[in-house]
């Protein structure tokens, strides 16, 4: 199925690209979320009329994400207190939700979907580097310090 992308989609294309995707992906994800429209003749003409507006919106979203990334980096580190055993192992784990709440409490609004924990949940005390994906191509890193309660 041919669609026109209205937003930058990772591994698929940029704003305005006409791409061929599976019909289920288009019907169930891209079109309902407003990230694409079917590539009919009328939609192509309508998109070309709105191209500048959509590209300006995409640039504004990128600039906002870069500003948030600078705020996250400026925090330096965030401390999270959790119950732990004698050997430095946590009772439970620090998940993306816990990291997002700690960063939001520190003053920068972060959604849990933006937190990336590549090694899974944090299960030990100490310093851990956590990545945040604030936009398709904007990343920030923050030091999360886990201490015993």
Curated annotation (Swiss-Prot):
Gene Ontology cellular-component terms listed: ribonucleoprotein complex; ribosome
GO MF terms, alphabetically ordered: rRNA binding; structural constituent of ribosome
Pfam families referenced in this protein's UniProt entry, alphabetically: Ribosomal_L9_C (PF03948), Ribosomal_L9_N (PF01281)
InterPro entries: Ribosomal_bL9, Ribosomal_bL9/RNase_H1_N, Ribosomal_bL9_bac/chp, Ribosomal_bL9_C, Ribosomal_bL9_C_sf, Ribosomal_bL9_N, Ribosomal_bL9_N_sf
Any GO BP: translation
Keywords for this protein: Ribonucleoprotein, Ribosomal protein, RNA-binding, rRNA-binding
UniProt similarity note: Belongs to the bacterial ribosomal protein bL9 family.
Described purpose of this protein according to its UniProt entry: Binds to the 23S rRNA.
PANTHER family: 50S RIBOSOMAL PROTEIN L9
Protein name per the record: Large ribosomal subunit protein bL9
Lineage: Bacteria, Pseudomonadati, Pseudomonadota, Gammaproteobacteria, Pasteurellales
Name of the gene: rplI
């Amino acid at each position: 199925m041919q669609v026109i992308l209205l937003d930058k989609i990772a591994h698929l294309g940029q704003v305005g690209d006409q791409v061929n995707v599976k019909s289920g992906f288009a019907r169930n994800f891209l079109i309902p979320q407003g990230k694409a429209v079917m590539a009919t003749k009328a939609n192509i003409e309508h998109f070309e009329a709105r191209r500048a507006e959509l590209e300006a919106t995409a640039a504004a979203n990128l600039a906002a994400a870069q500003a948030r990334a600078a705020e996250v980096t400026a925090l330096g580190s965030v401390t999270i207190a959790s119950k732990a055993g004698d050997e430095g192992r946590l009772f439970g784990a620090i998940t993306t939700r816990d990291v997002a709440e700690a960063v939001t409490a520190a003053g920068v609004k972060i959604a849990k979907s933006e937190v990336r924990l590549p090694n899974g949940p944090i299960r030990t005390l100490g310093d851990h580097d956590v990545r945040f994906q604030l936009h398709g191509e904007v990343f920030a890193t923050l030091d999360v310090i886990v201490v015993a309660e």
